[in-house]
Amino acid sequence: MENKKTIYFLCTGNSCRSQMAEAWGKQYLGDKWNVYSAGIEVHGVNPNAIKAMNEVNIDITNQTSDIIDANILNRADLVVTLCSHADSVCPSTPPDVNRVHWGFDDPAGKEWSEFQRVRDEIGERIKRFSETGE
């Protein structure tokens, strides 16, 4: 079997957006990609992110909030920043690491409907990537 590629989702606190992206990534990309997420800082997994993903039958209670791991970052096939802060302060990556920015609003501290909206937007974006490679 061919080695899987690695995708690394990054946001500021590895609390909401990147946690959701990791979960969606495992669902849509898991057969071809190793999927990880991390943050510039560690804020813990937001309970509303867990609740939002449970609504779509994806359990992220065992996911952890992690700081960027240089080993994963430097070996990833694709690094995806999910917020402008992570995009601007993300450590440099080697030239062979493809880095893209997919911006999503931060639902933390906002109404419940924002968690649902951002969850669905991230899921749709990753599904599209799984189908088109873009």
Swiss-Prot record:
Source superkingdom: Bacteria
CC annotations in GO: cytoplasm
EC number: 1.20.4.4
GO molecular function, one term: protein tyrosine phosphatase activity
Protein location: Cytoplasm
Catalytic activity: arsenate + [thioredoxin]-dithiol + H(+) = arsenite + [thioredoxin]-disulfide + H2O
Record-annotated active site: 11 (nucleophile), 83 (nucleophile), 90 (nucleophile)
Keywords from the UniProt entry: Arsenical resistance, Cytoplasm, Disulfide bond, Oxidoreductase, Redox-active center
Disulfide bonds: 11-83, 83-90
Keyword field contains Disulfide bond: yes
Family matches, as InterPro entries: Arsenate_reductase_ArsC, Ptyr_pPase, Ptyr_pPase_sf
Gene3D superfamilies, A to Z: 3.40.50.2300
One GO BP: response to arsenic-containing substance
EC top class, as a word: oxidoreductase
Function: Catalyzes the reduction of arsenate [As(V)] to arsenite [As(III)].
Entry-linked NCBIfam families: arsC_pI258_fam (TIGR02691), PRK13530.1 (NF010053)
Record-stated family: Belongs to the low molecular weight phosphotyrosine protein phosphatase family. Thioredoxin-coupled ArsC subfamily.
PANTHER family (alphabetical): ARSENATE REDUCTASE
Protein name, as recorded: Arsenate reductase
Gene that this polypeptide is encoded by: arsC
